[in-house]
Amino acid sequence: MRAVVQRVISSKVEVDGKVIGSIGKGLNVLLGISKEDTEEDIKYLKEKIINLRIFEDENEKLNKSLLDIGGDIIIVSQFTLYGDCRKGRRPSFIEALGGEEASILYNKFVESIKKEVNNVATGEFGADMKVYIENDGPVTILLDSRKTF
């Protein structure tokens, strides 16, 4: 399971011109799910994301987590995080989990976050979305539950 975690001032997702999710200060998470992912990957990434100390304290040090600041989180499914561009010029998405199986793991991930964070918004799994991200910093962290980078 992979995530691009961005510290944001605000973020929102639109589908067919309608805002379906929005947040204020917090994290925008683009989430990719692979064919090998399990509930253990969900647990690992959830704990890592909500406890990442990427928010500034009173001394402007990155010492506070999303939980510490009571921030919001928006989670957007993005299978393209498993795009393999090592051969040719067109990405291969063969490692990405698709369809119903990916939707189930995505929803389990969202539910696990909702148990910890007050304001959780999402995109629409499988939809063509417009994602608006107002970065803060910018601070962008790449995470992989298989620790490949």
Curated annotation (Swiss-Prot):
- Where, by residue number, is the motif Gly-cisPro motif, important for rejection of L-amino acids? 137-138
Q: Which reaction does it catalyse?
A: glycyl-tRNA(Ala) + H2O = tRNA(Ala) + glycine + H(+); a D-aminoacyl-tRNA + H2O = a tRNA + a D-alpha-amino acid + H(+)
Any one GO CC term of this protein is:
cytoplasm
**Superkingdom of this entry's organism?**
Bacteria
What keywords does the record list, in alphabetical order? Cytoplasm, Hydrolase, RNA-binding, tRNA-binding
Where mainly found?
cytoplasm
GO biological process: any one?
A: D-amino acid catabolic process
Q: Give the family per the record.
A: Belongs to the DTD family.
Q: What NCBIfam families does the annotation carry?
A: D-aminoacyl-tRNA deacylase
Q: Tell me the PANTHER family matching this sequence.
A: D-AMINOACYL-TRNA DEACYLASE 1, D-TYROSYL-TRNA TYR DEACYLASE
Q: What is this protein called?
A: D-aminoacyl-tRNA deacylase
Q: What is the lineage of its organism?
A: Bacteria, Bacillati, Bacillota, Clostridia, Eubacteriales
